[in-house]
């Protein structure tokens, strides 16, 4: 099935030898790529030699000149604007200092440097104006470094003064950091992660008081931080100079002047190379060589020296390298004498593990590493609390993520995806009958974990390019292959095994050495900027090839070809008729994983089992309407958004059942009173929200109640009170949802209004049903108002906008201008009108039996004698509304994208994302409409005698 990869074991063994022989006894080693940022700091070091002041690394200055781009920038990154900002700012600073003091570099024309500075500063200004990923990319120390660089630039040239939208957010981050950190804390003996960024503290720190933190000449293995120390400490540190000279020669720059951003990365590379190879299927005998033992000893000694934990280098401890080191020693069978206990004691927090002490926000991949290290231990049950904690954290992070998962240590979403699948695959395999974690997790948690794995696998499959790679990136493609290989082990993904096998076969050619060509675009590991690690990349290539060559499938043809009536129905819709059969089936399989979770909530609001209605088959259908459209459009809204909307969809069906089966009989003689009940309930819940006393308002109804003012309540009185209680639970669920409470006031106001209209429309329809035609109203008026309000579309859309405002928008208003708001409300009205029309097309027969008002009952349709002709006429009107919706959405998108970007804590470009969410909701609405035309999806009332 797969291309035959010869000599893999020999290549892997050769890589182990290369890694083992790279370790310098004093300085360790690093194969991380050169970075402009650190090179610029090295270029700014000057020294007195024989009475003359000289640049210590003149080659580094020349390196900067060689690397400047045509647009004046230095090494911008396609996935991180922060990288370009840092590189360009640091390089401009170096050029400004050199043009003032050329020292021994007299052969470089000052005029040329000045022109380069002008181009560089112009580029920096443009980059700062466009900088919108300061939070998303989350580079180490960015909140400290960029403000410092801008100050340094202004000190060199008073005309430098940048204004940019994200400046306020950056300074807010800076203030929050400084509130938690005192530079004077570095004078103490205990090392701090801030030692990695001393260049951001010039003028705020007495560098003479931090020299005791030097280890083998470096400040926490950072050339830029060490350069700042060497420049500002007195006396001159020969130890620091020796370290930098070693990095200059032994680093990946090899004397060219380029400096890596971190040196050494000894433990990082040793652990990543070995664990990556062994996790993919290489055995100890495959890798056996003298260097293997020496590597294991080096790792074990690192644990001993740093008291049970390690870092990427000595005395730079973190949870990633500690967990990876534990995993490596376990896989080597040499974990005697090391334990997770020190890691847990140092890095465990309330609901996750810290990467390092003082961390601003948690890392997804760090917690993946912790979980993997614990799951591979023979005594894993001893660490069950930590296993549960990290599993919950990762699951919640995946479910909450809008779009692809992100992590601050890597710019490719494929890397954290791979790690999560590796960890969660172990969870699922070890939770099987007879396995050690069989009773460790409840069914709901395992369902959530399964959804994470399934989504990760499917989205990886869907993202593969025609050439077999992922985004044209060799290393990221290896992550994808390893994700698929791990997924292929699970029964959960059995139906997708043919697609997994085909994708891995297609990727095989990319991984062949002849096509393995990394570029700057493969610099996806992040620290202060971004970098590549040559030996780690080589390990991932071999691991992906090994995993592909080892994978065998036992495909059950019955599973892969299985279909059902609903799936066949979906394939007939315009929206899904062009979707490949396997992709459609995959979305059905993903949807099925949500069904048990949805059923857990079916009685949260309404006691549906006590209502005389047919079985709620729609529960099996609802998840697909959201999952299928999400996968089809590749929108990838958050899984939590999907599930919240599934529940709202379920409640939409249940509220229809409730009004028809319970409210209508109870209020048959007093419909006007039901309007009063609706207003009372909605007003009371809104008051609670406004007053922020949720759950504490006197008189709140939470269950079945009776009116205590009635001495001997009648059956009718009890029924009326219970209906009010049910309505209260429904309104509570919607308006007290955590994301609704954190949405902008504009979105909450719209939801309040639409929810009230929705409930009143049900009451109005109760009255209309008694005559099968509302007197004195035209069809046009009715279908755009009461009828449209009666379907759940408008309030569900408002609910979705609240979620988007609270999560992606961080509380921003979804629609910032009057034009945006008008157009989106117009789109919502077209959606609701179209939805009602299509609903009525599908329910003509049921509405006749149950005496429900339907569009075709209006006099305007009386000229058509056949029901089929009436349906066709209504379908043409629905098509007109859809064309209006399409046009309005296009106008809305144009309006949004022309509006200014709002600087806030919102991640990414909120403008483009909110357009995607609105279009996604419109797709789901359109899909429901297409289904309604093909089949009536609602439950039927059970009449007496049936």
UniProtKB/Swiss-Prot annotation:
Q: Which reaction does it catalyse?
A: ent-copalyl diphosphate = ent-kaur-16-ene + diphosphate; (2E,6E,10E)-geranylgeranyl diphosphate = ent-copalyl diphosphate
Name the domain of life: Eukaryota
Q: Which SUPFAM superfamilies match?
A: Terpenoid cyclases/Protein prenyltransferases (SSF48239)
Keywords per UniProt = Isomerase, Lyase, Magnesium, Metal-binding
Please tell me where Mg(2+) 1 binds in this chain: 656, 660
Instruction: Please indicate if the UniProt record lists Translocase as a keyword.
Output: no
CC cofactor: Mg(2+)
- Which annotated residues bind Mg(2+) 2? 656, 660
EC number(s) per entry: 4.2.3.19, 5.5.1.13
Q: Where Mg(2+) 3 is bound, by residue?
A: 839-840, 843, 847
Biological process terms from the Gene Ontology for this record are: gibberellin biosynthetic process
As annotated in the record, motif DEXXE motif runs over: 656-660
Where does this protein act, in terms of pathway? Plant hormone biosynthesis; gibberellin biosynthesis
Task: Give the function comment from the record.
Answer: Catalyzes the conversion of geranylgeranyl diphosphate to the gibberellin precursor ent-kaurene diphosphate in a two step process.
What is written about domains in the entry's comments? The Asp-Asp-Xaa-Xaa-Asp/Glu (DDXXD/E) motif is important for the catalytic activity, presumably through binding to Mg(2+).
Q: Which family does it belong to?
A: Belongs to the terpene synthase family.
Protein name in UniProt: Ent-kaur-16-ene synthase
What organism does this protein naturally occur in? Answer: Phaeosphaeria sp. (strain L487)
